[in-house]
Design a protein with these regions (language model features):
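Enriched for short, Lys/Arg-rich terminal
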Residues: 1-7, 16, 60-66, 70-96
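Short, intrinsically disordered, mixed-charge
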Residues: 23, 34, 38, 93-96
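Short alpha-helical segments used as structural interaction elements across diverse proteins
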Residues: 14, 19, 23, 51-56, ...
């Protein structure tokens, strides 16, 4: 699967969270987004209320971060990012 096949877009929530990141956090995030573009199935597919959403886990400075996204034909929508604490509760609230 070619990474140039996908267009990346983001929700306002994702944009607000990334705006608070430091430069090195953004660089790590960019690498992880490239990994998702290369293999959109890399994230765990969610069920129930979050059906159609995938969550990719990665570490930054020993802290695990979760990146929620969805894939539609030629677009990857970055939904939200954060640590595990209250992550799924907040994600469900945003998706509804």
């Amino acid at each position: 699967m070619s990474s140039d096949r996908f267009r990346i877009s983001q929700t306002p929530l994702f944009g607000r969270k990334v705006k608070k990141f430091k430069k090195n956090e953004k660089e790590t995030l960019d690498r992880e987004v490239q990994r998702i573009m290369a293999d959109p199935d890399i994230g765990a597919e969610k069920k129930g209320d979050l059906q159609g959403i995938r969550v990719h886990r990665y570490k930054f400075n020993s802290q695990e971060l979760l990146l929620a996204y969805s894939v539609e034909e030629d677009e990857i929508l970055l939904i939200t990012i954060g640590s595990h604490e209250n992550y799924y509760r907040d994600l469900k609230g945003y998706v509804k």
